[in-house]
């Protein structure tokens, strides 16, 4: 018999990680109610540093040359591209060789997250086929059981009762048939009206041709869905004429068509440089005429997602729902630039066509789900709480040798709810699922700070490496009304980061910083003047000084974000050691940062609030919660 969800108690469970050599396995990462005691002398040094910074000097946010023990290593080989999927290794810009850093085991162990989902060891990428079944949330994921690099892709499987605490299960599917022998790649789940679960996934054949295959649970009454059967008639779809054999992958969840009993699904592809979404009718797997949508110049579309959102209320919708008060979201992961783009529009099921509300914001040329390290996202409808939930892959941006040393690579984002932004009419709102708040430890620390131009203040928290912060910022109205003097054409990625000062920015928080601010990751707002002369807000995450190690990504992520009349500038950050997920204005703009500090680790991480503007006084209001660790461990199958 399968264990019922109610018999799993996270309060009495233990997390098991795979620790590096020389590091004792201490079991569950300790609760973060009180991580360490700061000595009086340390407090004195911190206050002294803060005083020096505040003494008529702007924050120490300038870029400096790193000093580190460096070695040259061979260039990282390409992985995945030759088989027809996106590049799976982070490519340093240094050419034929790259600079690597000598990481200690303590540093690498610190990088492992405490409440984001990741396997015990080895490589992980795309989230696959998320669903809810008989009391359990199921997450499948691309996994290499042999190594911390991409290859031998298998479907990992885990279950949860709350999307936060997870139990690893045996592999759902392995590459063991001619039609998937080179990889059981990304797929989606469709739940039929009678409760039958159909999983459609891409297989890489023995001839490296991308085909679509069906699988289904061997025992639908099993809440854990432990055993899966591959359909004997696989493959059910092969690349159609005019489509490359390596340009046909990642089927979506199916939805009901206009004809009785008809089911439709879409698959990403390209024709030349035009990204397209093909549509198939599933009763006989017939390719329908035309395409659901196409956008020239966007290249190969991977991991396409297509679903409805309500313009009237805050509930999520089943993928097949259509009617009044409905918009549809088309999302594609762009192989050319490794970005997840989306567009909101109207779906005509009779003509099988999607039309964007604003062609200037079309898929691939407009809005992104996340402006940081975030790719291959996948949503599902959660019938338990009537919401649409979004998963995304957070990949590595360090060296492959470092991943091999630590023995794992990549995590999944915290699941997010997705809603239509009724105020703008153009954006989605993404927000961490409410269950993450169950990890909050006690009452929040509440702080209100009046920040003069060029000031920074240390915030004393129990842990500056594992927390949830909500912050709002109010710019003095007199200065804000002088927007005519602000700069025009600001761009996060080309701005110079938090060290670049203007009349109205930057201002925000500094996370995962050491006490001297030699390593820091600022997340901030910057107000500029738009082409129409009105104030335009930007939301940015600056990684340029996030690490003194060479060979890791150091750039500024971000985009503009609508801040409407009467709204304060608001942000929420989930900080989990080497991951920072940042949400602006209720989730209109989101940035995921993957960082690799060398100093701000093992209790040395600090949290600051700052205002590096030259002319604006900013009032910051903050609530900060320390977060407990999630329980992520193997399912006790011996109890079945």
From Swiss-Prot:
CC terms in the record's Gene Ontology section: membrane; vacuolar lumen
Region (Disordered): 1-22, 62-89
Pfam families for this protein: Glyco_hydro_32C, Glyco_hydro_32N, INV_N
Major subcellular site: membrane
Hydrolase among keywords: yes
Domain of life: Eukaryota
Reactions catalysed according to its record: Hydrolysis of terminal non-reducing beta-D-fructofuranoside residues in beta-D-fructofuranosides
Topological domains, Cytoplasmic: 1-33
Active site location: 126
Residues excised as propeptide: 1-99
Binding site residues for substrate: 123-126, 142, 150, 185-186, 249-250, 302, 335
Parts of the chain that traverse the membrane: 34-54
EC number: 3.2.1.26
Membrane topology: Single-pass type II membrane protein
UniProt GO molecular function: beta-fructofuranosidase activity
Disulphide-bridged cysteine pairs: 492-540
SMART domains associated with the record: Glyco_32
Complex formation: May be present in two forms, a 70 kDa monomer and a heterodimer of the 30 kDa and 38 kDa subunits. The ratio of the levels of the two forms within cells appears to be regulated developmentally.
PANTHER family tied to this protein: BETA-FRUCTOFURANOSIDASE, INSOLUBLE ISOENZYME CWINV1-RELATED
Protein name: Acid beta-fructofuranosidase AIV-18
Organism: Capsicum annuum
């Amino acid at each position: 018999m399968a264990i019922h969800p109610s018999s799993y108690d996270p309060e009495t469970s233990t997390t098991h990680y795979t620790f590096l050599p020389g590091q004792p396995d201490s079991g569950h990462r300790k609760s973060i109610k009180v991580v360490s005691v700061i000595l009086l002398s340390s407090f004195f040094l911190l206050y002294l540093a803060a005083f020096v910074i505040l003494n008529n000097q702007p924050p120490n946010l300038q870029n400096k040359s790193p000093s580190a023990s460096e070695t040259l290593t061979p260039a990282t080989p390409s992985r995945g591209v030759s088989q027809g999927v996106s590049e799976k290794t982070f490519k340093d810009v240094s050419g034929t060789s790259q600079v690597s850093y000598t990481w200690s085991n303590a540093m690498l162990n610190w990088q492992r997250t405490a409440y984001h989902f990741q396997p015990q060891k080895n490589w992980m990428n795309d989230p696959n086929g998320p669903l809810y079944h008989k009391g359990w949330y199921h997450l499948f994921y691309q996994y290499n059981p042999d190594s911390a690099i991409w290859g031998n892709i298998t479907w990992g499987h885990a279950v949860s009762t709350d999307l936060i605490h997870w139990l690893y299960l045996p592999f759902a599917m392995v590459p063991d048939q001619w039609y998937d022998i080179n990889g059981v790649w990304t797929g989606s789940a469709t739940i039929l009206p009678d409760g039958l679960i159909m999983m459609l996934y891409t297989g890489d054949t023995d001839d490296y041709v991308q085909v679509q295959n069906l699988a289904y649970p061997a025992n639908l009454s099993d809440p854990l869905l432990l055993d899966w059967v591959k359909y004997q008639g696989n493959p059910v779809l092969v690349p159609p004429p005019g489509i490359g054999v390596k340009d046909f992958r990642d089927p979506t969840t199916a939805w009901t068509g206009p004809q009785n009993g008809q089911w439709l699904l879409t698959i990403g592809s390209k024709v030349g440089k035009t990204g397209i979404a093909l549509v198939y009718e599933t009763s006989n797997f017939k390719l329908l005429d035309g395409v659901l949508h196409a956008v020239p110049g966007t290249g190969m579309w991977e991991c396409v997602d297509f679903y409805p959102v309500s313009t009237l209320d805050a509930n999520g919708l089943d993928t097949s729902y259509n009617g009044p008060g409905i918009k549809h979201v088309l999302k594609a992961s762009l192989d050319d630039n490794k970005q997840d783009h989306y567009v909101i529009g109207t779906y005509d099921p009779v003509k099988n066509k999607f039309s964007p509300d604003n062609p200037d914001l079309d898929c691939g040329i407009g809005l992104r789900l996340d402006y940081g390290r975030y790719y291959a996202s996948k949503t599902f409808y959660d019938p338990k709480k009537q919401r649409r939930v979004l998963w995304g892959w957070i990949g590595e941006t360090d060296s492959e040798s470092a991943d091999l040393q630590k023995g794992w690579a990549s995590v999944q984002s915290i699941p997010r709810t997705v809603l239509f932004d009724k105020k703008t009419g153009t954006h989605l709102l993404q927000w961490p699922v409410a269950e993450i708040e169950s990890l909050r430890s006690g009452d929040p620390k509440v702080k209100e700070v009046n920040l003069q131009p060029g000031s920074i203040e240390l915030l004393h928290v129990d842990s500056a490496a594992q927390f949830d912060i909500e912050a709002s910022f109010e710019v003095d109205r007199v200065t804000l009304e002088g927007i005519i003097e602000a700069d025009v054409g600001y761009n996060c990625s080309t701005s110079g980061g938090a060290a670049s000062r203007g009349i109205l920015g930057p201002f925000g928080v500094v996370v995962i910083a050491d006490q001297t601010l030699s390593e820091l990751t600022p997340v901030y707002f910057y107000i500029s003047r738009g082409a129409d002369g009105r104030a335009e807000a930007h939301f940015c995450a600056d990684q340029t000084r996030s690490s003194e190690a060479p060979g890791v990504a150091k750039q500024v992520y971000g985009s503009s974000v609508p801040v409407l009349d009467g709204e304060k500038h608001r942000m929420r950050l989930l900080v989990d050691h080497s991951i920072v997920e940042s949400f602006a204005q209720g989730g209109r703009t989101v940035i995921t940062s993957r960082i690799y500090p060398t100093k701000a680790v093992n209790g040395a991480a600090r949290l600051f609030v700052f205002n590096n503007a030259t002319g604006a006084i900013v009032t910051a209001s903050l609530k900060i919660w320390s977060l407990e660790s999630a329980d992520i461990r193997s399912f006790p199958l011996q109890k079945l």
